[in-house]
Amino acid sequence: MIIELISSDFDALLKGIAPRHVHLVQDSAIAPPEVLAMLNRLATDVGANFSPSAWMIVEDDEIVGLCSVIKVPQDGKIHIGYGVAPSRQGRGCTTRAIGQLLVWARNDPRVSLVSAETGVENIASQRVLERNGFIRIGERIDAEDGPLICWEAMAV
């Protein structure tokens, strides 16, 4: 399931503490501290204009990953990013979470389109999006991440 992240949740995660009523993955981190700090900044920036902007991915009361709106939405389009702890990959957690995010988006009148990008080598992430009805719309080269595949799913 996805649960909206609030600033105190990020504060807890940055301290290595489980937020609210969930447990931390014990055998691997959901994200390195620098990634958590970056996601916290993104959530604050995006959240000033659009909320919710970040969610915990929770399975069996354990926070296994995160999903975020990573750019300020424009014209009904939200751009998402997501990740799951390495020890919880390959179990369908991300596929279920992105499916739930799409249900939320389709019930939010502010959202008409959800976009995401995956590395060309990240087959697992590509499958997550395909299983949730995303359509490959092109490719681009990112200065930091290299070749990326661009995806979109209608939210109306």
Give the predicted meaning of each segment.
Residues 100, 117-118, 141:
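Proline- and acidic/polar-enriched loop/turn elements at helix boundaries
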Residues 116-126:
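Conserved beta-strand-loop-alpha-helix junction that forms the acyl-donor binding cleft
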Residues 1-79, 85-87, 104, 108, ...:
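GNAT-family acyltransferases
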Residues 96, 113-114, 137:
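A local structural micro-motif
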Residues 107-117:
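Conserved GNAT acetyl-CoA-binding A-motif
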Residues 82-84, 90-105, 127-131:
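Conserved acetyl-CoA-binding loop-helix of GNAT-fold acetyltransferases
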Residues 92, 124, 146:
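Residues that form or flank phosphate/diphosphate-binding pockets in enzymes
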